[in-house]
Amino acid sequence: MKKQRNLRSMAAQAIEQVVEQGQSLSNILPPLQQKVSDKDKALLQELCFGVLRTLSQSDWLINKLMARPMTGKQRTVHYLIMVGLYQLLYTRIPPHAALAETVEGAVAIKRPQLKGLINGVLRQFQRQQDELLAEFNASDARYLHPSWLLKRLQKAYPEQWQSIVEANNQRPPMWLRVNRTHHSRDSWLALLDEAGMKGFPHADYPDAVQLETPAPVHALPGFEEGWVTVQDASAQGCMTWLAPQNGEHILDLCAAPGGKTTHILEVAPEAQVLAVDIDEQRLSRVYDNLKRLGMKATVKQGDGRYPSQWCGEQQFDRILLDAPCSATGVIRRHPDIKWLRRDRDIPELAQLQSEILDAIWSHLKSGGTLVYATCSVLPEENSLQIKAFLQRTADAELCETGTPEQPGKQNLPGAEEGDGFFYAKLIKK
């Protein structure tokens, strides 16, 4: 039996690591969840995701409720108060229980002398809640985004930025990809129905299913046998543009964690696929996905800017470049992105993307297809990136996939329930 731990203090420490140390929640949370019971795993995730989704609100409230911010070794208490505020505002946890557990969290982080302070701040919020929230809802902090990102979204999407922000602040739906080598989508949906769950097919992407209610993967029919994979609908759209064929040599660049690698092999089981990623640790997830689905691909660690180091002079029929990006299209899935990214990251990422595009283009066969994809909504990484590439690359031709005013297709967050995503399909003359 696992030792009873204070979930509020664990959440506060995790959030502190994200905000103060720039660590990714997807790296921090799983090891913490291993330390708690199954029933507590979901609550720990809810507290971490929820506070990060609404961070600017709790920051704003604490500044109103406290004369001085908590600093130094007491900084964790700041995040513990955030966890308390989130419970009072957004969960069905009874207020007395939320307060008691949060105050007790001070003992777990070895700050028992601050229990009275935490209790006082949270009770003061309860007394002034209506007045404080009215003031908050009239401020820019209500958008729950950092100001630099808000400015970029307003500039790029003067008519749509508010709906993008709203979508980013929602909980995401759970999308699945049915493995067509095992079942048709309709036959798997029938199995899902037999298991007492409901799913809905995507109108455009033939393997995509949205669950009515998110569920643990082990509850999904045939998950362990590789019948289905968790993957957002927008990410599945890459295969529509790539259109892999049996017998082709296909490169999946920046491939981890392997969702698109395995999708290529579901669509074209006899394709020769090379999956490459710069992050050796994340490549372990590519191997795991291939193993679960019973598929084979060549997997290599490598930097996309220097392809000759990992593929020599090899030429490919098709290349999928899921480029490193700001991930501003998947904030609803990874709310820590709002606080991990900085404005200065965008030009640096755009430069890296252009270097990878230029380097990999020489490894595409004449007549071959390259699909450039990102999970960003920022034009500098997407339409402007492709415009610049077309201007400097004489043998590159764009396949029309989107609206006339931009090369490529930009999906915005929440459109057809999918993530924000960009695709451009290029043919080598």
UniProtKB/Swiss-Prot annotation:
GO process terms (BP): regulation of DNA-templated transcription; rRNA base methylation
Is Methyltransferase there in the keyword field? yes
According to its UniProt record, which protein family does this protein belong to?
Belongs to the class I-like SAM-binding methyltransferase superfamily. RsmB/NOP family.
Q: Where in the cell is it found?
A: Cytoplasm
* Any Pfam family matching the protein: Methyltr_RsmB-F
Q: Which NCBIfam families match?
A: PRK10901.1 (NF008149), PRK14902.1 (NF011494), rsmB (TIGR00563)
Q: What is the lineage of its organism?
A: Bacteria, Pseudomonadati, Pseudomonadota, Gammaproteobacteria, Enterobacterales
State where S-adenosyl-L-methionine binds.
C254, A255, A256, P257, G258, G259, K260, D277, D303, D322
Its annotated function is as follows:
Specifically methylates the cytosine at position 967 (m5C967) of 16S rRNA.
InterPro entries noted in UniProt: MeTrfase_RsmB-F_NOP2_cat, MeTrfase_RsmB-F_NOP2_dom, NusB-like_sf, NusB_RsmB_TIM44, RCMT, rRNA_ssu_MeTfrase_B, rRNA_ssu_MeTfrase_B_ent, RsmB-like_ferredoxin
Q: Could you tell me what reaction this enzyme catalyses?
A: cytidine(967) in 16S rRNA + S-adenosyl-L-methionine = 5-methylcytidine(967) in 16S rRNA + S-adenosyl-L-homocysteine + H(+)
Q: What class of enzyme is it?
A: transferase
Q: What PANTHER family does the record tag this protein with?
A: NOL1_NOP2_SUN FAMILY PROTEIN _ ANTITERMINATION NUSB DOMAIN-CONTAINING PROTEIN (PTHR22807:SF61), NOP2 YEAST -RELATED NOL1/NOP2/FMU SUN DOMAIN-CONTAINING (PTHR22807)
Q: Which Gene3D superfamilies match?
A: Helix hairpin bin, NusB-like, Sun protein, domain 3, Vaccinia Virus protein VP39
One GO CC annotation: cytosol
Protein name per the record: Ribosomal RNA small subunit methyltransferase B
What Enzyme Commission number(s) does the record list for this chain?
Answer: 2.1.1.176
Q: Which GO terms describe its molecular function?
A: RNA binding; rRNA (cytosine-C5-)-methyltransferase activity
Reply yes or no: does the keyword S-adenosyl-L-methionine apply.
Answer: yes
Domain of life of the native organism = Bacteria
Q: Where is the active site?
A: C375
Q: Which UniProt keywords apply?
A: Cytoplasm, Methyltransferase, RNA-binding, rRNA processing, S-adenosyl-L-methionine, Transferase
Q: What is its main location?
A: cytoplasm
